[in-house]
C-alpha cells in the first residue's frame, strides 16, 4: 500500500472519530430549575455553569459549603463510569442502581459525611453523567433524590 493511501486512510479514520464520540452536552440543559426544586423540596436558583461539564443548582441564601442544599451534574466519560462500577480503592463501594437509563451505579465513599459521599454515575448510549445531591444527612434519601434527577435527565439525552 502506498504512503499516500495510508495517509488518506489515517486522515479518514481520525476525521470520522468525532462522529462516533459521545455527544457534547450542556449539563445545565439536563434538568430544569423546577425539577431540581421539586426534588430538594425547596426553591433553587437558576442553573449555574461552574465549568464546561459541570452545572449546579443551589438553594438561595446558603453558605457556599458541602453542607448546603444543592445539586450538581457533571458530564462524564466511559472511563470514569468504569471506575465507578469497579472501584480500585477499598474505601469506595459500588452499589447497582436499577431503572435508570441504560445502566447506573452509586459510588459511595466510607469515612466521609453523608451527602458528599454518594454519587450516581449514569450511562445512556454513548453519554455519561454524574448526579450529586448535597446537604441532606440521610444517605438513602440522597440516593433516592439522585435517582429521581437522573431519570429526569435521561429523558433529555
Each language-model region and where it sits:
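Generic N-terminal leader/processing signal
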Residues: 16, 67-68, 121-122
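Small/flexible residues
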Residues: 11-12, 20, 71-72, 81, ...
Amino acid at each position: 500500500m502506498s504512503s499516500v493511501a495510508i495517509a488518506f486512510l489515517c486522515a479518514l479514520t481520525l476525521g470520522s472519530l468525532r462522529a462516533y464520540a459521545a455527544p457534547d452536552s450542556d449539563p445545565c440543559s439536563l434538568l430544569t430549575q423546577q425539577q431540581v426544586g421539586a426534588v430538594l423540596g425547596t426553591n433553587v436558583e437558576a442553573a449555574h455553569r461552574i465549568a464546561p461539564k459541570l452545572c449546579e443548582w443551589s438553594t438561595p441564601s446558603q453558605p457556599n459549603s458541602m453542607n448546603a442544599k444543592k445539586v450538581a451534574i457533571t458530564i462524564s466519560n466511559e472511563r470514569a463510569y468504569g471506575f465507578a462500577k469497579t472501584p480500585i480503592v477499598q474505601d469506595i463501594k459500588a452499589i447497582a442502581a436499577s431503572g435508570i437509563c441504560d445502566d447506573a451505579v452509586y459510588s459511595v465513599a466510607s469515612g466521609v459525611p453523608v451527602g458528599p459521599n454518594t454519587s450516581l454515575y449514569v450511562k445512556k448510549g454513548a453519554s455519561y453523567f454524574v448526579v450529586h445531591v448535597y446537604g441532606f444527612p440521610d444517605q438513602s434519601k440522597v440516593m433516592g433524590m439522585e435517582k429521581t434527577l437522573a431519570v429526569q435527565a435521561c429523558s433529555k439525552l
